[in-house]
Structures are given as structure tokens and as C-alpha cells.
From Swiss-Prot:
Name of this protein: Transcription antitermination protein NusB
UniProtKB keywords: RNA-binding, Transcription, Transcription antitermination, Transcription regulation
Gene Ontology cellular component list: cytosol
Function: Involved in transcription antitermination. Required for transcription of ribosomal RNA (rRNA) genes. Binds specifically to the boxA antiterminator sequence of the ribosomal RNA (rrn) operons.
Record-stated family: Belongs to the NusB family.
Domain of life, source organism: Bacteria
InterPro entries reported for this sequence: NusB-like_sf, NusB_fam, NusB_RsmB_TIM44
Pfam families for this protein: NusB
A biological process from GO: DNA-templated transcription termination
């Protein structure tokens, strides 16, 4: 499996998580929308599905891991940063085949692509704290 296929799956998953967080729509509906309306060229679709459904169904558990490392309420974290951190926390917690450095670096790249100017620093710092605690 090419790393670029997983990278594309992560990019699509972050967008789906973001959309789901804001819309509150049914998980299956959001997944269907992304699988039918987005280009899936070079995307590891199975990995996209796992990441998106995993984050959506384990949101409470993921947030319980994230919240102790925040310096503000989770509701004050931008939706983009929240989507990225939840995705990375899912990978760090449930995908032991993904090295923690890969999960963190991918999250930083997602924050650079989708977040505000300083998002990547926030994401990096938070995930470093999360990994140090494990």
C-alpha cells in the first residue's frame, strides 16, 4: 500500500469528520456523501471508512483522552483542529500498526493544509503530550 493512499484517506477523513461535526448529520449519510461526491483517485477507501467511522463512533472516548491535555475547553478548539486531533488520537490509540511519529507528522501536515496559521503548532504540542502520557 502506497503511503500516499493513506495520506489521501486521512485528508478525506478529516474533511468528513469536520463536515459531520458541523452538520450533526448521520454518520452513514456523511460517509456516503464523501464517497459519492469526492474524487477517490488514489485514496485508500477502506482506511478512509475506518478513520471516519472510528472517530465518529468513538468521539467520547477520544475526547476523554484529549481533554486533559487542553488548556481550554474542547468547545473552544476550532472544528478543523478538533477533527485533526481526533483523527490522530484515533490512529495513536487504535492503529498500533501506524508508528506514532507517522500519526503526528500526518496530523501536522493536515493542520498546515486545513488549519489556521498556528494550528500545526497546537496539534503538534497536544499530540506530543498525549504520546508522552501513554
Amino acid at each position: 500500500m502506497k503511503p500516499s493512499e493513506r495520506r489521501k484517506a486521512r485528508r478525506l477523513a478529516v474533511q468528513a469528520i469536520y463536515s459531520w461535526q458541523l452538520s450533526g448529520n448521520n454518520i452513514a449519510d456523511v460517509e456516503h456523501e464523501f464517497l459519492t461526491e469526492q474524487s477517490l483517485d488514489g485514496v485508500d477507501v477502506a482506511y478512509f471508512r475506518e478513520l471516519f467511522s472510528g472517530v465518529a463512533t468513538k468521539k467520547t472516548q477520544l475526547d476523554e483522552l484529549i481533554i486533559p491535555h487542553l488548556e481550554r475547553p474542547i468547545d473552544e478548539v476550532s472544528p478543523v483542529e478538533k477533527a485533526i486531533v481526533r483523527l490522530a488520537t484515533y490512529e495513536l490509540t487504535f492503529r498500533k500498526d501506524v508508528p506514532y511519529k507517522v500519526a503526528i507528522n500526518e496530523a501536522i501536515e493536515l493542520a498546515k493544509a486545513f488549519g489556521a496559521d498556528e494550528s500545526h503548532k497546537f496539534v503538534n504540542g497536544l499530540l506530543d503530550k498525549l504520546v508522552a502520557r501513554k
